Every structure is written in structure tokens, then in C-alpha cells.
Amino acid sequence: MIQKILLTFLVTAVSLLHSQAQNMKFHTNKVIAHRGAWKAAPHPQNSLASLQQAIDMGCEGSEFDVWMTADGILVANHDADHEGMMIEEATYAELLQKPLPNGEKLPTAEAYIKKGMTQHGTKLIFEIKPSQISKERGQELATKSVELVKKLKAERWIDYITFDYDIGLKVLELDPEANVAYLTGDKTPQELKDDGFFGFDYNIRTVKENPQWIEEAHTLGLTVNAWTVNQEEDMRWLLEKKVDFITTDEPEILFSLIK
């Protein structure tokens, strides 16, 4: 009898978790906060505070940049250095000696993702930075990134982006269901489609120079994003072209145009 009750409880619990996952609804407003929302309400870029601000604003996504330390820890930071210390050449313990301006410690990618997983509205746009040491190290970072996301069961929160095409291909090799967009701007929509990418995420200048790529991408079932779009004129142009996402340091301005 007790076994039947326990079995019924387990089946109910699993069904509830499955239902919650199926009902997970992320925002669909196109607004991707670049390095989090950090400018209008000042926060350090790529900090947990800037992520929380993007979540509180209701952004569709919050972008963050990931490097790997000398001792193999994945950390969120835009530049190759943190307070003058080269991230790839320093241990995480060494990097922790210099906190962010708001007092936060330099966040690990794991801490950033766990913070994002406390809600179901804002996706996490995980930029895997190309290694400045070697291509092999970039591949290792890609592998560790996918392993981390899988360990945390965070796949539904994560879209990957990268400037290194081989890193993108590595992510897709390890997780063929992953959403991976390419940043550099030197691939056509057809090339991206052929290699299994989710879409392109190109500089606004590149998108304006190749406006036909927007329709081509959509015809192929790919998504279109542009970075870093801070001018209202460019935002309006992209909205008229019905792009899927707009990455900006000025999410407040973009929200004012879409509401």
C-alpha cells in the first residue's frame, strides 16, 4: 500500500514538473539587454545586478560574455581582462581579489545562469568568447559551456552566440538542439542554415548593408538579431523590418518604441 502511495506521489510530481516546463513562457518583445541592463540604472556590466535589472524590466533576453580562467572556471566578463588581470592567465581566486564596483565578486557563469533560472521571462544569451591563447582553448570553453548548461538543466533558458564559427559548430556538435547564433557577419543565411545555426546576430551596419538577408533568413526559418543598437532611428528601422531581436545598451528606449 505504501509503495503504491509513493509511486502515485512520484508520478504526480514528475507530471507537475513536466507541465511547468511545458508552460514556461518567455517574453517575446525583441529586447535583448546587452551585458544586462546597466546604463540607465547604473550597474556593472555583466553583473548579477545588471541581470536582475533586465529581468525586472521584462527584457526578452539578457546577454552575457563568458571567458575561462587559467584554472578552468567560466566567468562572466566582457573584456579579456578584469581590472588589469588577463582572465585566461589568472586563476579565479586571483580575480576575486578585485570585486566589481558595486561590491559583487566577479560572477561565474554558473552563478549567472542560476540567477537567471529563478524566473521564466528573460532568456540568457550566452556569448562564448574566442580564446586569445589558442583555438583549442576556445573549443574547451565551448565544451565546458555546454556541459555546464546541461548540468544545470538550463537548456530552455539559454541561447548561445559567438564570434568564432568553430565554437558555434562545437556547441551544435555537443547539443544539436541548442540555439546558436553567429556574430561576425561573414556568413550568408544559407550557410548558417546548412550548418545548423539558429540565426544570425550581426552588427547593425552589416544588417543595413545586407537588408535582403533579413527576408532570406526568415524564409529559411532562421532568426535575425542586430547589435549594438542604441540609436532610435536604427531601432525603428529594425522594427519595420520585423527582426526577431534587437540587442541594445538602451532597453528603455526600445521599450518606449514597442509599447
Map each language-model feature to its residues.
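Bacterial Sec-dependent N-terminal signal peptides
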Residues: 1-25
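Phosphate-group recognition and catalysis centered on beta-loop-alpha active-site segments
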Residues: 20-259
